Amino acid sequence: MPVPPPPPPPLPPPPPPLGAPPPPPPSAPPVSTDTSSLRRADPKGRSALLADIQQGTRLRKVTQINDRSAPQIESSKGTNKEGGGSANTRGASTPPTLGDLFAGGFPVLRPAGQRDVAGGKTGQGPGSRAPSPRLPNKTISGPLIPPASPRLGNTSEAHGAARTAPPRPNVPAPPPPTPPPPPPPLPPPLPSSSPIKTPLVSPPGPLTKGNLPVVAPPVPCAPPPPPPPPPPTPPPLPPASVLSDKAVKPQLAPLHLPPIPPPLPLLPPCGYPGLKAEPASPAQDAQEPPAPPPPLPPYASCSPRASLPAPPLPGVNSSSETPPPLPPKSPSFQAPPQKAGAQALPAPPAPPGSQPFLQKKRHGRPGAGGGKLNPPPAPPARSPTTELSSKSQQATAWTPTQQPGGQLRNGSLHIIDDFESKFTFHSVEDFPPPDEYKPCQKIYPSKIPRSRTPGPWLQAEAVGQSSDDIKGRNSQLSLKTLR
């Protein structure tokens, strides 16, 4: 209330100066008489300026306008209507508009507190007041928006339950370390690297649901947990399978060691993480439940970072009947092929040689182990960038041994190969050999003394012609050398 009154006071001071200018043309005394008469006869104002000044004085006197506006805007509307009528009759509406703006502004602030009443009335108010009601409405919608965000979260949970999933991955993750006392060391490294651990547990979910894999690939980096929520029913199987896998891994690995040697080339790529071996063992433990294969995709999800681990496996995975449908369903190319590979070749993934290798690879995957395996392939692939044939030969040489591993660990190399595979390059042999370089004396016109003697212009012209001839000769020589 005290704040609104101050604005009107400034208005009164201007009236005297404004009143003063009109009187100056006549004599000084008549000025006072005119002002007094005008003040006495309000409706009969001689000039619009005087009428405006008088209106301002009235507004100043009626400081209660602020009080009227304070309770509700309707009162201010009534005052506006009255003032507007008087202003129209007098021909000056500017001061009342200013007063309305001030009065409307203050009540708008008050209704902000009263969202319900102020919202409707402010909406009825003039355009200047309308924005303020919109703000309260927005504030009301603001609370609604937060629920919307939870709804979005719910939708995300329905699609991937990224936020809710984390607790689930955490829950299954703790059990695996506890059940197998010997393997606990292996899980700890994975927990140390949260991203890796989460993918192990979370990927199973996305794999179980073909639609979710889309969310899984983007999520694997930060929130791999989303996939697990989708398969609430299978999750018990995956945790049990994971626990049983970890507990039985030692047994499974020795059992499948004989088949391991042949698949080793394929396994090393998957084995570099050592995680793939684990998924394979789950598949072996329980091939009936689809949950065990999902664990493999988690590693695949980790491998997707390599970006092309799957392509090598699809050929091998095609043999398995069930895997083929899965790969088409899941947009993530890497995860489905690995699933197929796990199902088709449960023994090969499990047999990365022996658990000691798995442990080493697991420890190495976050850090040195994987890096050591992959770096060697990188230089050969990059060194012969100029010659595709040599590169392809080297790539083939690497493929039997560590091609998948290199692809999984070092996705950049594989990406480079794919990028170059999109284009066809000619080998150096396809191009004709360059002509032999024959040293020849070149004559440059700049070195020719232009004016041996200050002769006539004809000599200069002759020199110019000779320079042109020399240029032509040089160009021909250069072309021959280039050919």
Curated annotation (Swiss-Prot):
PROSITE patterns (UniProt xref): WH2
Keyword Phosphoprotein: yes
One of the protein's GO biological processes: retrograde transport, endosome to Golgi
Lineage: superkingdom: Eukaryota
Span(s) of short sequence motif WASP-binding motif: 424-448
Function: May be a regulator of cytoskeletal organization. May have a role in spermatogenesis.
Family: Belongs to the verprolin family.
Name this protein carries in UniProt: WAS/WASL-interacting protein family member 3
Lineage: Eukaryota, Metazoa, Chordata, Craniata, Vertebrata
